[in-house]
Amino acid sequence: MPDELIFHKFFEVFNRRDIEEMGNLLNPTAELFFPKTRPLVGKEHVLKFVNILLRQYPKLSFKIERVIQQGDRAAVHWTNQGMNRRKEPYQNEGVTILETHNGKISFISDFFKNTDAF
């Protein structure tokens, strides 16, 4: 899959809450850097974190606003909205830096405006 497609597919899969398909997109040694958490290394650790995040936000949907790509790296500007498990509305805006290696996502780093919810 070309890098441009995998960057979009990552968010499509997240919106569908398809953990199995997300695992197919990740390199076995994928790294995730997320505000207020320690770095996570390895596909299993990343997927475990995503599962926890999805439980905290039973409704959460991302909309890609723009993608700035340079080779196997991209900065994806997004907005999101949803509801947390206490049924409180949630919305945010941010950028996710993604990098691929051998056709799989190997690096994810999130930056967003509102970190108070975490």
Protein language model regions, located:
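Short, cysteine-centered beta-strand-loop-beta hairpins and adjacent loop/turn segments enriched
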Residues: 82-91
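Short, surface-exposed coil-to-beta transition loops
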Residues: 61-62, 77, 90-96
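Hydrophobic beta-strand positions in extracellular immunoglobulin-like domains
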Residues: 80-82, 100
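Short beta-strand edge/turn micro-motifs at domain boundaries
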Residues: 93, 97-116
